[in-house]
Amino acid sequence: MKEFIIRDGKKLRLGYTTGSCAAAAAKAAAWMLLSGRKKESIRLLTPKGMELALAVEDIYLSPDCVRCAIRKDSGDDPDITRDTLIYAEVRKTETVGIVIDGGQGVGRVTKPGLDQPVGAAAINSVPRRMIQEAVEEVCGLLGYTGGLYVVISAPDGETLAKKTFNPRLGIEGGISILGTTGIVEPMSEQALVDTIHVELRQRRAGGADYVLLAPGNYGVDYIKGAMGIDPATAVMTSNFIGDALEICRELGFRGALLIGHIGKLVKLAGGMWNTHSRYGDCRMDILTACAAAEGLQGGAAAEMLCCATCDDALRLLKEQGLYDAVLHRLAGRIDDMMHYKCSDIETGAILFSKEYGYLCETKGASKLLRRIKED
């Protein structure tokens, strides 16, 4: 694709989804099967309203079956499916209608709560509709009223899936065919939030009332090493802590416990619900404010404001004899902000640092932890 967007002052090239690849491949294969003629390019109108003109690759053409592929172009997005070939194989059937299924390298759903039912190929609803409409368009143009069987495959999918959330979500054997707009926008925050939503929805469908959240690998490692909990029980939120809490509320969880490094979670005390540094860095401001409320003054406060890391600030608090008091105040502030954010579910947080280990927790954290272990 040649289309671009501007993000954070950078010009970034758009791409197209695996769903667009599957629909375009199915459209091309259906056209070749029903017309008997080879087609080396295909046009596809995406749900976003953008039309794609895509090269058709690796064509196999016979009277009974046509198979071809579209190469995934992720644009400037760091997508693991970049350059992967997504295949569609189309055959005529004696029954009326279009049947869509997954083949090699397309995962199968094994747990409830996902976009597709258990046992179905992991081809999500929008890509299924895109495939259906693309094939129906060809049938209409060529006057075909019979049935067609469409199989979507991705030969590299089983290997690629090991680098995705699919194994944790209960999708086995391959990748998912995804996309709601048909277009990939580089570094899309919404795509990351959607991933969190999928995993939380799957946990809720599995019967969980309480959920453990971790912003990143530090939190997961701490959960495993210091708390003796299977890290697979935690849902990774990345920087989208506020979104994750709102999703928990929306899905009907009774409670959510957040476990993370102080460098991330201190920002919650300032009402910063997306903790990415592009939205600001208030770590030392918040810690210094908490310390000042506990009596830190003058030069020591100025020194804390200049600390490069939270561990440096904690070291200074120890020297000033304010370590416990400030952490207690910080936990209280985080508790207040989490309650303000999601007052209709139980929330809690446990903070740690790599140098000092366990630091503090909000007042409901221990109870939530027990419930998560029992859930």
Regions found by a protein language model. Name each.
Residues 3-6, 13, 169-175, 180-329, ...:
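A structural signal for small-residue-enriched, beta-sheet-centric alpha/beta enzyme cores
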Residues 1-18, 32, 36-39, 140-141, ...:
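N-terminal charge/polar-biased segments
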Residues 1-163, 167-169, 364:
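Generic N-terminal targeting/processing segments that precede catalytic cores or assembly contacts
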Residues 159, 220, 358:
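Flexible, glycine-rich phosphate/dinucleotide-binding loops
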